[in-house]
Amino acid sequence: MTTPKIQLAGVTKSFDGKQVLRGIDVAVEAQESLCIIGTSGCGKSVSLKCLLGLIVADGGSIKIDGQEILGANRKKLEATRRRFGMTFQFGALFDSLPIWQNVTFRLVQSQKMSRDDARQIARDTITQLGLAPNVIDQYPAELSGGMQKRVALARAIADKPEILLFDEPTS
């Protein structure tokens, strides 16, 4: 049997005494897709944030390729996060940055690439998602909500992550 790419076992999380996650058990194999559906406030976003180590689960186990990340040190969490691309429930674009910088923010921070290389990656990724190449010089407020969602998706895939997570992908 192969080790799951992602495995959550018995994951729990509470906020102010209210339990949001109660013993979540999920295993996702490589090349497999999983969709978690539930009512508003049931813990879908919290599960993803625990998986990324953005918030710490109260208990259970969270593994990526068999490596425990729950309780991992900052360096290990950062290395794990680099393997993921994610779109958040709310676009989370930087209003003060042009689209090309929004798309390549993580790439530039982690790989110290040139401005020209970053702009080209942004242009290629934006075009791949059906937006006009000239969009890269605009700012988020100049785009429709749907276009902003595509920019958030472009940012998630620009550095070709190993694992993609989408919070509210149908919105």
Language model features: what each stretch is:
Residues 52:
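Helix-to-loop junction immediately C-terminal to a conserved catalytic motif
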Residues 67-68, 115-134:
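Conserved ABC ATPase "signature" region
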Residues 69-85, 115-116:
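ABC ATPase NBD coupling module
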Residues 96-105:
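Short coil-to-helix segment of the ABC ATPase nucleotide-binding domain corresponding to the Q-loop/switch region
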Residues 139-143, 147:
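Conserved ABC ATPase signature
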Residues 160:
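Conserved catalytic motifs of ABC-family nucleotide-binding domains
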Residues 164-167:
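Catalytic Walker B motif of ABC-type/P-loop ATPase nucleotide-binding domains
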